[in-house]
């Protein structure tokens, strides 16, 4: 990112490391760079957005192939640990390089394969075609302002995916008479995409607040009617606190089989979604809108269109329906 930004003369900072010691099993969410000013055109935006994920994949893919080939086959009897999710790309690489194993067995990833899996996982998140994630940069570079109109719908698909996945798991277990026995595991397996649905709204809310402060500093006497009439009213701090509470409660209650323990959790989840429907992310909003480039009407050339399509295709190949239990 930094090199591509400098080549296009975009003012950019060196990477800022993002530690996440408790919520991430890898201790980090990678790094970000800060870019000031407006990017010149969509070609420059694509180069900046696609360079990081593609460079990371060039490292992570061969490392995973090497690492999984040197991983151990172990018995699943009495095993405890985190079961990592599978994507289409991971299934393909496992088919090519992983050792064969039978019923009652699984693969214990080597440290190299585990680190590479983490790199692919972070790249998948970063390639979400939303907001100012790298996938958002690439999608805006390819589709222009049309992508901003589609962004809220794409964003809500994350919530729909969570709702369908959790509901299907609960209904299946209810039919087998083990609903309360597995509710903690089902919530833990499916909560990830709900968290990212809310996380993108939180990041978008804080980013819009910074832009509003910058406009006020640049023009203290300017007209702020647009800010006063914003359709999204739910504070990002309220959204962050509610989401964190839901995640922590589910973690502490995971081993519980009591309806009295889980009813408050589902009540809190329903309340947050009701607030989102009333004045939040389920209403029309611009929290995920990508800032325009200076020459927004200038389309990409044929080569860069191919690069953009390939980059977004990697998101599909990397998508993890159930990354891991939270």
Residue ranges, per PLM feature:
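Hydrophobic transmembrane alpha-helices and their immediate loop junctions
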Residues: 1-326
């Amino acid at each position: 990112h930094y090199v591509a930004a400098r080549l296009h003369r975009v003012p950019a900072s060196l990477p800022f490391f993002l530690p996440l010691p408790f919520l991430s099993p890898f201790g980090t969410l990678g790094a970000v760079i800060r870019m000031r000013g407006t990017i010149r055109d969509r070609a420059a935006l694509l180069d900046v957005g696609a360079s990081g994920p593609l460079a990371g994949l060039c490292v992570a893919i061969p490392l995973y192939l090497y690492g999984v080939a040197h991983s151990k086959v172990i018995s699943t009897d009495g095993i405890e640990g985190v079961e990592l999710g599978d994507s289409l790309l991971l299934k393909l690489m496992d088919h090519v390089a992983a050792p064969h194993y039978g019923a009652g067995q699984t693969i214990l990833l080597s440290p190299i394969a585990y680190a590479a899996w983490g790199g692919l996982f972070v790249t998948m998140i970063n390639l979400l075609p939303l907001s100012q994630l790298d996938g958002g940069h690439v999608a805006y570079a390819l589709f222009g302002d049309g992508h901003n109109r589609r962004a809220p719908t794409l964003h809500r698909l994350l919530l729909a995916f969570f709702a369908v996945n959790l509901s299907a798991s609960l209904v299946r277990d209810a039919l087998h008479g083990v609903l309360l026995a597995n509710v903690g595991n089902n919530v833990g397996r499916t909560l990830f995409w709900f968290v990212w649905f809310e996380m993108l709204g939180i990041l978008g809310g804080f980013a819009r607040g910074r832009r509003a402060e910058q406009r006020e500093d640049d023009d203290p006497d300017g007209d702020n009617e647009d800010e006063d009439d914003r359709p999204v009213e739910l504070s990002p701090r309220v959204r962050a606190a509610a989401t964190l509470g839901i995640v922590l409660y589910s973690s502490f209650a995971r081993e519980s089989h009591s309806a009295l323990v889980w009813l408050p959790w589902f009540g809190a989840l329903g309340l947050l979604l009701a607030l989102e429907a009333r004045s939040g992310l389920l209403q029309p909003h611009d929290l995920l809108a990508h800032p325009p480039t200076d020459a927004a009407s200038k389309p990409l050339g044929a080569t860069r269109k191919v690069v953009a399509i390939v980059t977004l295709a990697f998101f599909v190949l990397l998508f993890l329906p159930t990354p891991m239990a939270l």
